[in-house]
Regions:
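Basic- and aromatic-enriched surface patches that contact anionic nucleotides/nucleic acids
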Residues: 2-12, 16, 30-255
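Positively charged, structured surface patches that bind polyanionic biopolymers
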Residues: 26
Length: 255
C-alpha cells in the first residue's frame, strides 16, 4: 500500500548522499527528472540566504529502494534544492558576497588603519571578497596577505597588520561557525513507499504548477521508467544527451 514516511536529514547528510554514489546510503537522480530549468545564480543565492536566515525551505521527496542491503533513495522532487545544498557544503565561499561584510566590520578595519571615510567601505569589501572567493573554506586560513594589502592600500604602517589579522580572523571564524551550524540544519524529507512506476506521474503532478517545462522536458518526464523507445528526432536525442551529460558532470549517478 502506498504511503509516506517523514524523515529528518541534516544538510551534511543530504550533501554526502548526493555526491558519494558508492556509499551504502545514497541518492540517485531518476530518468524522469528534468535537466534544464535548473536554478540560476540568483535563485541559488536566495536559497542559501534562506538557510542562513533560518527560513523554511520546503521538503524533499524520495523513493526508497533496497537491493543487496544497499539503501538507495530516488530523488523524486527537490533536485534544484539538493544541488544547491551540495554546492554550498562543498564550497561555501562561492556564496560569499560583498554584502556579506557589514558596515560595522568595515568601520572597525578603517579604525585600525586610522581612516574614517565610509566611501572606503567598498575597497575593504572588494579586497576581502576577492580573497575569500579563491578559497573553498573559511577554516584555518592565513590572513597575513589580505591584512598587508589593506595596510598598504590605506598607507598605514605595518605595525597595524597584527590587529588587522585578528579582526579579519574573528570575522571569518564567525562565517565558519555559521557554516557548521547550517551543515547541521535539518531539512524534512518525505519518503514515498508506493509503486515505483507511479513516480513520473507524481513528479508531473508536483511540478504541474511550478516552472513550466518545455516540450522536451515533458517528453522526458512522460517516459515510463522500464520501457525503451527509439527516438528518430535528432533534436530530442541531442537535448536528452546534453541533459544527462550535465547531470553526470555535476557528479550525479543516473538511475
Amino acid at each position: 500500500m502506498a504511503g509516506c514516511t517523514p524523515e529528518n536529514w541534516s544538510l551534511q547528510e543530504l550533501s554526502s548522499a548526493l555526491q558519494d554514489t558508492h556509499k551504502d546510503h545514497k541518492i540517485v537522480v531518476p530518468m524522469f527528472q528534468r535537466g534544464s530549468g535548473r536554478w540560476g545564480k540568483e535563485q541559488e543565492r536566495t536559497f542559501i540566504d534562506s538557510l542562513i536566515k533560518g527560513y523554511p525551505v520546503g521538503t524533499m521527496l524520495f523513493y526508497k529502494t533496497v537491493e543487496n542491503n544497499i539503501e538507495t533513495y530516488i530523488l523524486v522532487d527537490g533536485l534544484q534544492r539538493g544541488n544547491c545544498i551540495r554546492k554550498y557544503m562543498n564550497n561555501p565561499t562561492e556564496f560569499f558576497y560583498d554584502s556579506s561584510i557589514s558596515d560595522d566590520f568595515c568601520k572597525n578595519i578603517l579604525k585600525i588603519v586610522k581612516r574614517n571615510n565610509e566611501e572606503d567601505y567598498h575597497i575593504i569589501r572588494t579586497l576581502l571578497t576577492d580573497f575569500i572567493k579563491k578559497q573553498k573554506t573559511f577554516k584555518n586560513l592565513q590572513y597575513y596577505n589580505p591584512a598587508k594589502e589593506i595596510a598598504e592600500k590605506f598607507g598605514a604602517g605595518y605595525e597595524c597588520i597584527g590587529d588587522l589579522i585578528t579582526t579579519i580572523t574573528d570575522f571569518f571564524e564567525e562565517r565558519q561557525d555559521l557554516y557548521d551550524s547550517i551543515a547541521n540544519t535539518i531539512i524534512p524529507v518525505i519518503v514515498y513507499s508506493g509503486d515505483e512506476a507511479t513516480l513520473p506521474e507524481i513528479f508531473d503532478r508536483i511540478n504541474s504548477k511550478g516552472t513550466p517545462l518545455d516540450k522536451y522536458e515533458i517528453y522526458a518526464a512522460a517516459w515510463p521508467i522500464n520501457e525503451k523507445y527509439t527516438i528518430s528526432n535528432t533534436r530530442i536525442v541531442e537535448y536528452v544527451i546534453a541533459k544527462y551529460d550535465a547531470f553526470v558532470s555535476d557528479g550525479y549517478k543516473i538511475y
